[in-house]
Amino acid sequence: MPIDDAERERRRALLHAHYDVENAHDLDRIMATFSTDAEMLYNRQSFGDPKSIRTAHAYIGLSSTGGAFRGIRNVIDREHFTTDEIVVEGRLCGRHVGEFQGHSATERDVELPFVAFYRFGADGKLTSERVVMDLGRLAERA
């Protein structure tokens, strides 16, 4: 059954609130967007509890202490709505300054394209975040 305009706008607002706090690098506020039983999948790696979800966000660089990327921001290029999810085509942008998923730091500014699938509960909290990101640009050397 297709979603109505009100539900589409509710989900869009929740998604943009999540991206806003990610781009502000505020881990506490990022975690406040997740339900306590949420699951995050990143390139098929599962993070099934709040502690591991928090650690994964910090590892990437979405915290005030930094991580594999500096000056990181997630950019939404397109949004698509299904009955249950929002599908985002986007880019992670930042300087690759630390090891990430087996790729040593390149010290280059990169844009990594991704597709992400978000599911929100009735309470407005994320219950599922699944991200598939193309890391090929990290293997390229200048």
Regions found by a protein language model. Name each.
Residues 85-87, 109-140:
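Short beta-strand edge/turn micro-motifs at domain boundaries
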Residues 17-18:
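Generic hydrophobic alpha-helical segments
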